[in-house]
A protein has these predicted regions:
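Gram-negative outer-membrane beta-barrel transporters
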Residues: 6-11, 29-136
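C-terminal beta-signal and adjacent terminal beta-strands/loops
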Residues: 131-140, 147-149, 153, 158-203
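Gram-negative and organellar
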Residues: 11-13, 24
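Residue-level "hotspot" positions that anchor or transmit function at local structural transition points
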Residues: 52, 95, 99, 145-146, ...
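A secondary-structure boundary/capping signal
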Residues: 3, 7, 172-173
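Outer-membrane beta-barrel translocator domains and adjoining extracellular loop/strand segments
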Residues: 15-21, 81, 85-92, 119, ...
Length: 203
């Protein structure tokens, strides 16, 4: 099946921020009437403010789930998001912090039995997911504003249901191939993470 949607949002007095700086100056006695900036005394400010012009956002998304078999499915989704600032002279910094394009594609399998007699090879599930995010401008505080580069990662997970003890064991990895990247400007690099869990269902 398929899901599709589109949105268009219209804002007045959109809240963003402006950046300013305060400079303390010292008079230079060697030059009459001249001043120099005292570098240690520069103070930057980030203040919330309303947009002077109309701001609109629009976007669309599509999601697809296709069942190859009762046990297997292919899933995918794509989203497009766009910020429009009408009036190029508006000094506001919108801090939209959203990539224009991104998508996910995954393959999942459920209740898989690789043997009819050996319980060790029964009741398996898995998922493989690919994620792609386009580069975008991240606008935070003055020192944390810049481009977040395009990145892509693969996540995997395998689980087995153990019906005899009402338990499920799971092992997986996010960012399987250790594609070091950051998702916010100024944030830490994110690498591979491997995890496991054992869940008991107590009735």
């Amino acid at each position: 099946y398929m899901d599709m949607n589109y949105y268009y949002s219209y804002y007045t007095d959109f809240i963003g921020y402006k950046v300013g700086a305060k400079f303390n100056t010292l008079q230079d006695d060697t030059l009459t009437g001249a001043y120099e900036i005292a570098l240690p005394s520069i103070q930057a400010y980030r203040m919330a403010a309303n947009a002077e012009n109309t701001v609109t956002t629009q976007g669309a998304s599509i999601g697809i789930n296709y069942y190859i078999h009762s046990n297997y499915s292919i899933n995918g989704n794509y989203s497009w998001n766009k910020l429009n600032l009408k009036g190029t002279d508006d000094p506001i910094i919108p801090a939209y912090n959203t990539p224009e394009n991104k998508f996910n594609l995954s393959l999942t399998g459920r209740d898989l039995h690789f043997s009819n007699t050996n319980k060790l090879f029964r009741d398996f599930s898995f998922s493989i997911n690919y994620k792609w995010v386009e580069e975008f401008m991240f606008e935070g505080s003055p020192q944390f504003t810049g481009i977040v580069p395009t990145y892509d990662i693969i996540d995997i997970q395998i689980s087995k249901n153990i019906s005899e003890i009402n338990a499920n064991i799971k092992i997986g990895a996010t960012n399987l191939f250790n594609n070091n990247h950051f998702e916010v400007y100024g944030g830490p690099y994110i690498g591979r993470m491997i995890y496991s869990s054992l869940l008991f269902d107590i009735e």
